[in-house]
């Protein structure tokens, strides 16, 4: 009842409806892509924070209206709506992009107010959680996607409250001393001294191509399980609803289209702030065809999907990887056909071998930027969309084997699954492979021809 009374009072006094300039609405809809600038900005914030962060960008009309408010420099620096918001949002947003100045101001704020207590306080990280920038819009920061979303929700409410209070009379936050006391109360300090078992990829972003099924989907699951935010690209529209969670973004994307790749990367930058890890998995395995019956059109189609599209993705993701707070990493899903090609697979084998060479050259060129690339060569992974039960039975019968024997037809006599491949792809982006680049690792249970 009290809330309704307050809302009615604001409405009666012309302070409830927040007006948005038509010019700002047009500007928000036509905002230019700033993916590389956003990734570099995320790198700067992560450096001040001391850990990788998720950076979400909003340049819609409502956010732009607040960011471009004539008095934003005063209104936004009053403090949070309630002192407890400070735990999520910090006391005030960063205005503009000068993260270093924000760090200095935060350290000064801590020194001044920590003197009032006899307790020995540990300063929290001095990175902003909310940024208001004329070019980027409203940005929110978190150690994971959910945290960044919570900060966003809180500050959306804060913007509305500030604008309505200003329209009515004046916005007045709680005293800075009260805000500091909540930010540095005992429980929050105790959390700092607890051993934090953060996931391996907390605050980092992985991009996986061909992510709607098979090895690609398993890669998404493996990276999510390690705490990464994951962007999945696939030509199958099912990718958009693959997982309903804040740390996953599925984008329908034809990887042979440069413009669709650009759009996907723009959306990635706006949603999470960058890319730290790349898994190149998308590709096709055509039906067997010998060289004497292989048309140039078929050859070019396979090369376009398995090779050319990966070149475009690598080229366009490179600036993201270069700006990764913990250095960029790439896992490439190769094939047993690179070291051991088979008859009837000329185009596929050649495309995978060419991708292998591309990765090796990239390792040479990108090493100076701290980016590492490693290659997995799987074989006989049967739990993918390529293999139906009928096809499995036919291939097993061709070799005079049962389906189970066919699945385990390797020197270790074990089955290799999509999850096995995905787990290795994820570990290759982890600390165990920190000093390794351009490695080629078979994951096939031991193929005699590869050995």
Residue ranges and their predicted role:
Residues 285-288, 432-433, 437-451:
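Short C-terminal tail/terminal secondary-structure segment
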Residues 289-291, 295-300:
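Substrate-binding pocket helix/loop in short-chain dehydrogenase/reductase
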Residues 292, 340-346, 368, 413, ...:
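Active-site loop immediately N-terminal to the catalytic Tyr-X3-Lys motif
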Residues 314, 351, 359:
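Active-site helix of classical SDR
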Residues 319, 364-365, 434:
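Alpha-helical segment proximal to the catalytic Tyr-Lys
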Residues 335:
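Residue(s) in the substrate-gating loop at a strand-loop-helix junction
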Residues 367, 372, 436-438:
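Short, small/polar-rich loop/turn modules that mediate ligand/substrate recognition or access, typified
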């Amino acid at each position: 009842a009290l809330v309704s009374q307050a809302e009615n009072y604001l409405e009666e006094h012309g302070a409830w409806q927040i007006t948005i300039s038509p010019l700002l609405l047009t500007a928000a809809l036509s905002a230019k892509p700033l993916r590389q600038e956003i990734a570099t900005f995320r790198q700067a914030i992560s450096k001040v924070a001391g850990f990788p962060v998720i950076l979400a960008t909003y340049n819609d009309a409502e956010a732009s209206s607040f960011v471009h408010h004539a008095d934003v420099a005063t209104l936004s620096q009053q403090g949070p709506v309630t002192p407890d918001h400070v735990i999520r949002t910090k006391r005030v947003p960063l205005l503009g992009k000068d993260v270093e100045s924000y760090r200095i101001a935060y350290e000064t704020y801590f020194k001044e107010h920590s003197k009032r207590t006899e307790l020995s306080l540990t300063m929290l990280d001095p990175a902003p959680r909310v940024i208001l920038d004329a070019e980027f819009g409203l940005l929110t920061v978190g150690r994971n996607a959910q945290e960044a979303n919570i900060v966003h929700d809180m500050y959306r409410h804060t913007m509305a409250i500030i604008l309505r209070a200003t329209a009515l009379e004046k916005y007045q936050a709680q005293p800075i001393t009260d805000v500091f006391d909540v930010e540095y109360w005992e429980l929050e300090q105790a959390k700092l001294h607890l051993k934090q078992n953060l996931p391996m990829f907390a605050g980092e972003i992985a991009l996986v191509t061909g992510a709607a099924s098979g090895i690609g989907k398993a890669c998404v699951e493996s990276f999510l399980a390690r705490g990464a935010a994951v962007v999945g690209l696939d030509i199958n529209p099912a990718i958009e609803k693959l997982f309903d969670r804040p740390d996953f973004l599925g984008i329908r994307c034809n990887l042979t289209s440069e413009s669709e790749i650009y759009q996907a990367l723009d959306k990635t930058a706006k949603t999470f702030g960058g890319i730290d890890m790349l898994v190149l998995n998308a590709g096709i395995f055509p039906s067997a065809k010998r060289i004497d019956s292989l048309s140039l059109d078929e050859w070019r189609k396979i090369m376009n999907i398995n090779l050319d599209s990966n070149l475009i993705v690598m080229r366009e993701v490179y600036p993201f990887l270069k700006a990764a707070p913990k250095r960029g990493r790439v896992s490439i899903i190769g094939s047993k056909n690179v070291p051991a090609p088979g008859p009837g697979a000329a185009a596929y084998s050649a495309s995978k071998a060419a991708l292998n060479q591309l990765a090796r050259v990239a390792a040479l060129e990108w090493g100076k930027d701290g980016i590492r690339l490693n290659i997995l060569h799987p074989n006989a992974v049967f739990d993918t969309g390529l293999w139906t039960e009928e096809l499995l039975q036919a291939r097993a019968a061709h070799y005079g084997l049962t389906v189970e024997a066919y699945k385990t037809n390797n020197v270790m006599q074990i089955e290799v699954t999509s999850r096995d491949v995905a787990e290795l792809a994820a570990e290759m982006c982890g600390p165990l492979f920190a000093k390794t680049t351009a490695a080629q690792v078979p994951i096939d249970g031991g193929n005699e021809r590869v050995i």
